[in-house]
């Protein structure tokens, strides 16, 4: 079963291919059916998100309903991406769950100050993601689950 055309995509931004694979597998094993668009670094995510003409063609460039964002990446780190998203009138409504490799309270506080909606410590476990998504009220509104 695949995501319906009306289900928002989930954008996964992480420079580590292994992490992207594990996160995607975790979400899939938990029953998430949304299409997941993977970005290899922060700059790639910004290029996609700020491609305004893309929103005129939502089939080719769908606006994410949720962004899962790593912090430590080359080119543009997660802080930069988060700040750009949350200061843009068009994008700031997209919920962002930050992915951190350590439960570092300073890092978490900085992410919240920049506008993060939640955070999950890697490796991402479906149960933790589900709990955070539910807390944000996203579980039924954004995520596509099996019927």
Residue ranges, per PLM feature:
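Non-catalytic signal-transmission and effector/linker regions of two-component phosphorelay proteins
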Residues: 1-11, 16-37, 43-46, 50, ...
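Residue-level signal for the "D+5" position in two-component response regulator receiver
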Residues: 38, 75-76
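Receiver (REC) domain active-site loop signature in two-component systems and cognate sites
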Residues: 71-73
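Short, conserved "switch-loop" micro-motifs in signal-transduction and mechanochemical regulators
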Residues: 101-103
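Short, glycine/charged-rich "phosphate-handling" switch motifs in NTP-dependent
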Residues: 117
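A Lys-centered signature of the CheY-like receiver
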Residues: 122
């Amino acid at each position: 079963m695949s995501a319906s055309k009306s289900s928002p995509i989930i954008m996964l931004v992480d420079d580590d291919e292994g992490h992207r694979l594990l996160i995607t597998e975790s979400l899939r094993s938990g029953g998430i059916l949304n299409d997941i668009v993977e970005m290899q670094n922060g700059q790639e995510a910004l290029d996609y998100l700020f491609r305004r003409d893309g929103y005129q063609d939502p089939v080719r460039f769908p606006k994410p309903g949720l962004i899962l964002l790593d912090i430590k990446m080359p080119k543009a780190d997660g802080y930069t991406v988060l700040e750009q998203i949350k200061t843009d009138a068009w994008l700031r409504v997209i919920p962002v769950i930050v992915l951190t490799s350590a439960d570092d309270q300073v890092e978490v506080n900085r992410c919240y100050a920049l506008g993060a909606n939640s955070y999950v410590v890697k490796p991402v476990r479906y149960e933790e993601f589900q709990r955070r998504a539910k807390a944000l009220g996203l579980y039924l509104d954004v995520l596509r689950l099996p019927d």
